[in-house]
Amino acid sequence: MNRKVIVVIPAAGLGTRMSPVVRGESPRGGKKPRASKQFTDLAGTPILIRTLRIFAGVPEVGEIYVSLRKDEIAGFRARLEKEGKEILKKKVELVEGGEHRQQSVANALAAVSADKDDIVLVHDAVRPFVTPEIINEVIDAAGKHGAAIAGVPAIDTVKQVERTAEGALISSTIPRERVVMAQTPQGFRYEVIRKIFDEAAADGFMGTDEASLAERSGYKVSVVMGSPRNIKITTPADLQLAEFYLKSA
């Protein structure tokens, strides 16, 4: 099938949990501290650029849209031209993000021109260890089912709790075989992602991820196997683990 694959990377967050260890050059230029976790250096390269390189290396991917804070767009474009020439072999658009992830994705979708059966992947800016194999499996599952995510089985026992005046009390144990830990990319046929975002906006609904919007709109979301290494780098401990992964690769 001759379908286009579009990648959306929401990267407008501040990442306050990472701020104690943020290092590297600001996308706005200079060395002043900032808390944008996606620009944190990982072995000398910003996490966001590492993530973009993975998607740029997947032949099926045709276009990449990155949502950024308005004051970071010009600086990041300059960094891409300097450090990401292989990324720019794809069509790359930098768009202004929103206050929340969902708005950042919506802003990127507003800039996209696609047919109903094209595939849109949404991926966390700070998951630089995603593999081409995972990406392609999500593409295929999204094309078949309309909506798909990468996920990994839960390892720890999961408890459901009730909040009471006495504190959090366990109400039940959720069987682990019924639980997956959601990752990205999360993929959708274009007609599906447009519909779920339009419905969420009309109702003022804010979801925790794109799959939650699809669930709310009545879609069954397929799950493909992700990887324990496909971590989201949001804390100093995550950054240390990422550095270990690079050294052990």
Name every feature range the model reports, one short phrase each.
Residues 129-224:
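Conserved core of the sugar-phosphate nucleotidyltransferase
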Residues 2-74:
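N-terminal glycine-rich phosphate-binding loop and ensuing alpha1 helix
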Residues 61, 117, 144-147, 219, ...:
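Short, high-confidence coil segments that cap the C-terminus of an alpha-helix
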Residues 120-121:
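Short aromatic/hydrophobic "clamp" motif used to bind/position activated sugar donors
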Residues 230-249:
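Hydrophobic helical membrane-anchoring modules
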